[in-house]
Amino acid sequence: MEFVTNYTLEELKKRFTELGLEPYRAKQVFRWVYKKFVTDFEKMTDLGKKHRELLKEHFAFHPLEKLDRVEAPDAVKYLFKTKDGHILETVLIKERDHYTLCVSSQIGCAVGCTFCATALDGLKRNLSTAEIIDQYLQVQQDLGEEKIRNVVFMGMGEPLANYENVRKAVEIMVSPEGLDLSKRRITISTSGIVAQIKRMAQDPVMKEVNLAVSLNAVSQKKREELMPLTKTNTLEELMEVLKNYPLPKYRRITLEYVLIKGVNDSPNDAERLAKLIGRHKKKFKVNLIPFNPDPNLPYERPALTDIMKFQKVLWKYGISNFVRFSKGVEVFGACGQLRTQRLQLQRV
């Protein structure tokens, strides 16, 4: 069985033609799925019965099964199961005047960040385009009349290690015939795969979305301890490619910095971060993320006073920054936590 959501519009037109259907039928199906969020061929009233029966023989819509939905005042965490039995998570974040969806791009992760619950179980596989898009569709269907405005690839996995499937998902998200989201409303968060960031810079689809980079340390040694990936993607190489990254007008690259007590949260660390950014401060903004405690990880969140001291140093150098406390702490909202809890229960 194929999934409609694995195809761009042009790909679906070609596939429909192979099945003996007129190409414009693909546009009709796209309209039902991405404008009305209808995922049942029987409800697509502008398709004849013969066409609906043919499509039902070949296509389905949902590669994911919703296992759980856990709600907190500021977020809703969803657990999904894939057809081959893997568990992934998605978080709907309630902002003041809109909703942001945090999607996963892989089952587990190979980057191995020592402060991340997703890394505990290793990488199982990439998610397909359909599995990425289905996270959006099922959450939007659950949401009803209110609409998801922003999408951030900040869930499980390294998006740039699943480049082709993530790219196609982004293409569907920004297509006028697809979800028609603004490119300014989509963010790709990466641990810093230098070659793939260079690829993004040359990609007509990907270079238009927002780029966020998980930095987390201001020295190569410390970054290697926290993020093993950096052994082959050095801090020096990363900052060089970021400083030369072509940005759309009025955009900045977000440097994500998880603050961990006694590890990377001192005023001296902040001074070194400011020095790392140097004269390129108008190109970057810093997202300070206090570590979200996890019983499976050996780290602690810094005191609020230490967080404020760190922030004050960055302001001193004129570096735009903000503190983001994890949404959904009550529902194990940090990356991988609810999934890890579920997997542990399954093993008991």
Curated annotation (Swiss-Prot):
Active site (record annotation): 89 (proton acceptor), 335 (s-methylcysteine intermediate)
Keyword 4Fe-4S attached: yes
Catalytic activity field: adenosine(2503) in 23S rRNA + 2 reduced [2Fe-2S]-[ferredoxin] + 2 S-adenosyl-L-methionine = 2-methyladenosine(2503) in 23S rRNA + 5'-deoxyadenosine + L-methionine + 2 oxidized [2Fe-2S]-[ferredoxin] + S-adenosyl-L-homocysteine; adenosine(37) in tRNA + 2 reduced [2Fe-2S]-[ferredoxin] + 2 S-adenosyl-L-methionine = 2-methyladenosine(37) in tRNA + 5'-deoxyadenosine + L-methionine + 2 oxidized [2Fe-2S]-[ferredoxin] + S-adenosyl-L-homocysteine
An example Gene Ontology molecular-function term: tRNA (adenine(37)-C2)-methyltransferase activity
EC number: 2.1.1.192
Localization terms from the record: Cytoplasm
Entry's cofactor comment: Binds 1 [4Fe-4S] cluster. The cluster is coordinated with 3 cysteines and an exchangeable S-adenosyl-L-methionine.
Residues the record lists as binding [4Fe-4S] cluster: 109, 113, 116
GO cellular component: cytoplasm
Keyword vocabulary terms for this entry: 4Fe-4S, Cytoplasm, Disulfide bond, Iron, Iron-sulfur, Metal-binding, Methyltransferase, rRNA processing, S-adenosyl-L-methionine, Transferase, tRNA processing
Class of enzymatic activity (EC top level): transferase
Radical SAM core domain residues: 95-330
GO biological process: rRNA base methylation; tRNA methylation
Protein purpose: Specifically methylates position 2 of adenine 2503 in 23S rRNA and position 2 of adenine 37 in tRNAs.
Family per record: Belongs to the radical SAM superfamily. RlmN family.
NCBIfam families named in the record: rRNA_mod_RlmN (TIGR00048)
Miscellaneous notes: Reaction proceeds by a ping-pong mechanism involving intermediate methylation of a conserved cysteine residue.
UniProt name for this protein: Probable dual-specificity RNA methyltransferase RlmN
Gene that this sequence comes from: rlmN
